[in-house]
Amino acid sequence: MTLEEFINQWQSPSPTLLVHTSGSTGKPKPMLVEKRRMEASARITCSFLGLKRGDSALLCMPLDYIAGKMMVVRAIVWGLQLIEVSPCGHSLKQIDTPPVFAAMVPMQVYNSMQDDDERQKLWQIKHLIIGGGAISDEMAAELRLHPNAVWSTYGMTETLSHIALRRLSGPQASEWYEPFDGVNVSINADGCLVIDAPTVCALPLTTNDIAEIAADGRRFRIRGRKDNVICSGGIKLQIEEMEAKLRPYINVPFLISKRSDPKFGETVVMIAETNDIESLKTICKERLNKYEQPHKYIAVDSIPTTETGKPARAKAMEIAQTH
């Protein structure tokens, strides 16, 4: 979708817009969202960040998904100067002057950190929000040194982008997400986060994210997804936690997945962009406990991802099951 096409949709008399989920756990799903709720979400973010009318805002994500659409809505609602570049892994290469405000996915931030010119521009952004994927411990440690405000976002298409932020830069850096005013969270019987955000979502939303709520009853942190649990021989293993243990030691793209097994119920499978399986086995033996050890290693040309760069877990499970 082009910027002109989206603005035409936005300016149409219809009170709703058709959007699609990212497809990280399966096929992208269509859903209708209310424009007034998108406007409300935009105001909440811009107000929280302290953005001013006329501030520059970088649009570097596809307009097919909610993250890109919301950047345009923020610019319209708050009077920001929108700078559009083609969505790619090196968005900052396309601009000369760093924007005041930018929203990026972790891959774009990572790529910019590897290039001296891009890194310099990244460090001059006044307000940077990062969403659409996990932020590694290594990236978080680097971003802690960023001189301005950098945030990790928590949200989804159903909440019209994010409903909570956690600080990544400076002494205020935290692993806990702080919900916006008017947003309340709780945990259900399955340990999953429930979001009550009436401004942007008409009904309370039960997520698939296994979460922990802080003692203050407001802040929360995410452990992983309910559908990313491997139940192997009666032991529950969280895929994201296993990947986090391995990420500092494996220098090729990889994913942990699972396959059904007649003896254990489910077993751990590692999918990686390498044929050096023995090295992977050595690292796993050193860094994972005995229950977490992969039963199978699969070499692939490329790790399956969605159009927004998230791991395509459903596709990975297909690979794990059929190879």
What is each model feature region?
Residues 208-292:
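AMP-binding/adenylate-forming catalytic core of the ANL superfamily
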Residues 32-40, 56-111:
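AMP-binding/adenylate-forming
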